[in-house]
């Protein structure tokens, strides 16, 4: 999957870090001088080199993010149980749209703000009704920070190799690319959305190619082999 994305992107981008944050995993792909420059090809090697992180914006259990979270003025130890997922976090922050919110909730319950608040509360051993909804929306932002930390650290590792032009962007890919934009701001790097290198006909108002980039990239790569469309211009 990641190789299809990389092969399509390197036609248009000379130097960039592609960051594909999906429902379950995050792929970090280095493009240098218009070529794919990765160190690992197996999952084991890619995890060793921070090219594959098992963290995503829908299915990741919250217990995988941290052992403690701020709550009611204290650092609270969380439940080591699969009571809630990152989908609950981004549902509460308003960053998870219905079109990509396709996995069942951890408890099989409703995928609503109140349902997500209930699941976050359970991670802390309390009841959602003990606090107003805006409290749980604030609490969700704490969880969001815990997920950003390892992603940002991995990006810092890749950028520390040196030789990156000042205009080399972080390219946001996948349903969690809103986190890539956040990382770009914090790391003071340019940001570019992967949609910019796809032909307009690939996306529709109800469908974004960036949400399933590997599939869209395969379509474009196949089209370019068969018809010559589009080899060097996404427009």
Task: For each feature predicted by the language model, list its residue ranges.
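Helical "lid/coupling" subdomains associated with nucleotide-phosphate turnover
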Residues: 1-18, 27-235
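Conserved catalytic-loop position in the HRD/HxD motif
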Residues: 20-22
């Amino acid at each position: 999957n990641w190789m299809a994305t990389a092969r399509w992107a390197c036609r248009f981008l000379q130097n960039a870090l592609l960051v594909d944050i999906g429902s379950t995993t995050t792929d970090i792909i280095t493009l240098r001088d218009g070529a794919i420059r990765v160190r690992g090809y197996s999952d084991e090697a890619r995890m060793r080199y921070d090219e594959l992180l098992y963290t995503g914006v829908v299915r990741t259990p919250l217990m995988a993010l941290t052992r403690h979270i701020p709550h009611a003025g204290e650092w609270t130890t969380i439940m080591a149980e699969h009571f809630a997922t990152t989908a609950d976090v981004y549902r509460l922050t308003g960053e998870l749209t219905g079109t990509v919110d396709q996995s069942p909730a951890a408890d099989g319950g409703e995928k609503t703000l109140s349902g997500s608040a209930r699941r976050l509360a359970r991670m802390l051993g309390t009841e959602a009704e003990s606090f107003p909804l805006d409290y749980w929306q604030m609490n969700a932002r704490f969880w969001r920070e815990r997920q950003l930390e390892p992603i940002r650290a991995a990006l810092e590792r890749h950028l520390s190799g040196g030789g990156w032009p000042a205009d080399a962007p972080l390219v946001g890919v996948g349903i969690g690319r809103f986190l890539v934009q956040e990382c770009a701001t914090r790391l003071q790097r340019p940001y570019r959305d992967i949609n910019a290198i796809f032909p307009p006909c690939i996306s529709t108002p109800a469908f974004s190619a960036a949400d399933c980039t590997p599939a869209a990239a395969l379509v474009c790569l196949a089209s370019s082999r068969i018809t010559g469309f589009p080899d060097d211009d996404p427009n």
